Amino acid sequence: MNQVFDDNFKGDRVLSLITGLYTMLIKAHGDKKEFYMFDSLDPQKIYNASRNFEIIVWKLASKKNEENQPYLLSNEINSSQANLSFEREFGKIIGRTDYFAFTLSEKTERAVTRVIQSFTTGIFLPF
């Protein structure tokens, strides 16, 4: 995704950005596209993906090229009107990935708590 903000890059910046975001999400989900009941995910990776989305939104809104133009026109209809639908859509993605990471971390915490409780309340074995 750094390629999007490289002055020397002459290719399709939108394709580069979307491919980078897609790849990041797949990596955050453990390189999987299908999940089953007992599959698990690392909540920290999902959380990190959410922070990366925030960084991308910030860079798209603020980073300029050598001619003081944005690398990608993302949230402007014309020079006097801002189009905030871009930020709203990315805000939804950030909110969903944050909530998903929180839910996953709660699941992990509950599993650890159950193991500790069953261990501490277990029957002593004779020796």
Where does each model-flagged region fall?
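Mature extracellular/secreted ectodomains of secretory-pathway proteins
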Residues: 1-104, 111, 115-116
